[in-house]
Regions:
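ABC transporter nucleotide-binding domains
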Residues: 3, 10-177
């Protein structure tokens, strides 16, 4: 199993964000969380990516407990948060090179990810000059740099126009293959 969640609960004060959530995701599956605003979807993703801890229950990614083996989980997960943290004054390639240094990833992997996400025509531009769709692609490229086993994307299509929506879904589908 790539992801195993058992009885996860999370409270923010008196507000219950997650209540006894359980599920599993097998390698190769592409799944989505559906629910209204405030249903706990982003909270669950933050737990799975070790940004926050659950109050109760257990979650594993590739057999690693997210509350015990944070480093192993982080190495095996690529995460695109809802609010994509980009440095708008950096060039696309420069930004990816910076992130690649953090993961100790080769220059050839940067080129692979640029190609995979369709960023080649925009790779010479500053991130601040890009459309929302291309900024999402930069975030996705960053999440893919270290060739993670698991990819967690929080609202990757929010704010995209219909054409960009189709394009980013196709990129995600191709990455999942």
């Amino acid at each position: 199993m790539s992801i195993e969640v058992q009885n996860i609960s999370k409270n923010y004060g008196a507000q219950k964000a997650l209540d006894n959530v359980s599920f599993s995701v097998k390698k190769g599956e592409i799944v989505g969380f559906l629910g209204p605003n405030g249903a706990g979807k982003s909270t669950l993703m933050k737990i799975l990516t070790t940004y926050i801890t659950a109050d109760e229950g257990k979650a594993e990614v590739n057999g690693n407990d997210v509350s015990v083996n944070q480093k192993m989980v982080q190495q095996s997960v690529g995460y695109l948060p809802e609010h994509n943290p980009l440095y708008l004054d950096l060039y696309v390639r420069e930004y990816l090179e910076f992130n690649a240094d953090v993961y100790k990833v080769s220059k050839s992997r940067i080129e692979e990810v640029i190609e995979l996400t369709g960023l080649l025509p925009e790779s010479h531009k500053k991130i601040g000059q890009l459309s929302k769709g291309y900024r999402q692609r930069v975030g996705l490229a960053t999440a893919l740099l270290h060739n993670p086993d698991v990819l967690i994307l929080d609202e990757p299509t929010t704010g995209l126009d219909p054409n960009q929506l189709v394009e980013i879904r196709n990129v995600i589908k191709n990455v999942g293959k």
